């Protein structure tokens, strides 16, 4: 029989990484964008997807539906491994405003070669954005097409919980917001 003094944690309340989204926005189509796609492919081992501009911005020289960015979604153990590399570059320090109210967080790095990818002069150096979506067991009911459910208010992830999870799991430091 279990100890009465020791309270067990509910396994359904435990936080985990649902997905890690990596994004490189070049701001133009062409050779630089294909080189950025190579960087993401080297990092994740998956084929990245190109993002199109929503509307024309003449001052930036961007036309509507022009491919301007490349992104990739990683899940599972590979997501945790890549996130660990990214946080190591940031020295496990995030700001309070890096966390959203729904318990997700994101950050960026200046140079992809800090992640351990060998520098290739033909590719160059790119910065990239990391965005982490956290979840709990049972969150998939909100994603179903048939018999879709809603996540109850008590089961949702809040900003404080995500910050506490980051501090405990990665021994991270949360700096005050700007």
Curated annotation (Swiss-Prot):
UniProt KW keywords: Cytoplasm, Nucleus, Ribonucleoprotein, Ribosomal protein, RNA-binding, rRNA-binding
Biological processes per GO annotation: protein localization to nucleus; translation
PROSITE patterns in UniProt: RIBOSOMAL_L5
Location in the cell: Nucleus; Cytoplasm
Domain of life: Eukaryota
Pfam families: Ribosomal_L5, Ribosomal_L5_C
Any GO MF annotation of the entry: rRNA binding
A Gene Ontology term for the protein's cellular component: ribonucleoprotein complex
Alphabetized SUPFAM superfamilies for the sequence: RL5-like
Entries under InterPro entries matching the protein: Ribosomal_uL5, Ribosomal_uL5_C, Ribosomal_uL5_CS, Ribosomal_uL5_dom_sf, Ribosomal_uL5_N
Similarity section: Belongs to the universal ribosomal protein uL5 family.
Subunit structure: Component of the large ribosomal subunit.
Its biological purpose: Component of the ribosome, a large ribonucleoprotein complex responsible for the synthesis of proteins in the cell. The small ribosomal subunit (SSU) binds messenger RNAs (mRNAs) and translates the encoded message by selecting cognate aminoacyl-transfer RNA (tRNA) molecules. The large subunit (LSU) contains the ribosomal catalytic site termed the peptidyl transferase center (PTC), which catalyzes the formation of peptide bonds, thereby polymerizing the amino acids delivered by tRNAs into a polypeptide chain.
Protein name: Large ribosomal subunit protein uL5
Taxonomic classification: Eukaryota, Metazoa, Chordata, Craniata, Vertebrata
């Amino acid at each position: 029989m279990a100890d009465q003094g020791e309270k067990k944690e509910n396994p359904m309340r435990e936080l985990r990484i649902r997905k890690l989204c990596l994004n490189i926005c070049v701001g133009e189509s062409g050779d630089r964008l294909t080189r950025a796609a190579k960087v993401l492919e080297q990092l994740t081992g998956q084929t990245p997807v190109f993002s199109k501009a929503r509307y024309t911005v003449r001052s930036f020289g961007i036309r509507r539906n022009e491919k301007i960015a490349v992104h990739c979604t990683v899940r599972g153990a590979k997501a945790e491994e890549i996130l660990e590399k990214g946080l190591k570059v940031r020295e496990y320090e995030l700001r309070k405003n890096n966390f959203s109210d729904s318990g997700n967080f994101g950050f960026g790095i200046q140079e992809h070669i800090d992640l351990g990818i060998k520098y290739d002069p033909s590719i160059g150096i790119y910065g990239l954005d990391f965005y982490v979506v956290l979840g709990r067991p049972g969150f998939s009911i909100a994603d179903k097409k048939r018999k879709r459910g809603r996540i109850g208010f008590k089961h949702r992830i809040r900003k404080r919980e995500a910050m506490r999870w980051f501090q405990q799991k990665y021994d991270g430091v949360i700096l005050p917001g700007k």
